[in-house]
Structure formats: structure tokens, C-alpha cells
Amino acid sequence: MKLVICGKGGCGKSTVSALMARELAARGEKVLVVDTDESNFGLYKHLGLEQPKDYMESLGGKKGLGERLRKFMRSEGKEKLSILEDFSLEDIPTELIVGEDGIKLVAIGKIHDFGEGCACPMGALAREFIQKL
């Protein structure tokens, strides 16, 4: 089952996500929380976990992903945009996943510095990550 929590900023997405993850884990489900919010660093705290490393960095960071997106745009859609190969949870490097008590967390990417620029590569990666998982 895949479940996506979305909404306006400040409406409680992180709180609902953490509560849902805890409840599903308490029922014996294996839970993977995918943090796709590039500007909010709070979800790992709601889950009581350490902050994970950005998944995006394992793929060349924002610069590497941005170049893939630009190549796709220059092809005017003739090339297929594929950031990730097909994968399973076991294929995700262990250093990019944090977790305990039946809950695992992966963070797609975060804006770490003021004025860092566009988060478009993170959005594209998040979309494909969730589709292929």
C-alpha cells in the first residue's frame, strides 16, 4: 500500500504522517516514510529518529539531477526522463535509511542553504521514487 499525505504548509502533514506511521507499525506493518518536503526538516523529529542523509546526494546531488532534467528538456520530450533504475527497498543504500520500531525513513532531498535555488530536481526525484517503489 502506498499512502501520500499532502496539503498546504502548516496544515499538519508531518504530524499526520508520523501518527499514521506509528499506528501502522504498531499493527505490525512494515512502514517506509518517504520525506519529500524539501524545505521542512521536522518529520524525522516527529518520528523520533535521526535525520537521514539526502537520497538525492547518492545520485549526484542537485547538480547531477538538474543536468538530467535539462537534458530531457533539451530533447523536447523525445528522450525518456528516467532518474532511477527500477529498484526495491533492499536496493536503497543502508546509510540513507534511518529507522527503528518498524518505521524506516528516507529523505529525498532538502534545501540546506539560503538562496540555494530551485527544488525542481527534488520534486522530479520524489515523483519517480514513489512511482517505482
Give a label for each model feature.
Residues I5:
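Hydrophobic anchor at the beta1->P-loop junction of P-loop NTPases
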Residues G10:
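Walker A (P-loop) phosphate-binding loop of P-loop NTPases
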Residues K13:
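Conserved lysine of the Walker
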Residues V16, M20:
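Hydrophobic positions on the alpha1 helix immediately C-terminal to the Walker A/P-loop
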Residues A25-D101:
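N-terminal phosphate/diphosphate-binding loop that engages ATP/GTP or pyrophosphate donors
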Residues K78-L133:
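Phosphate-binding/switch loop-helix module in NTP-utilizing enzymes
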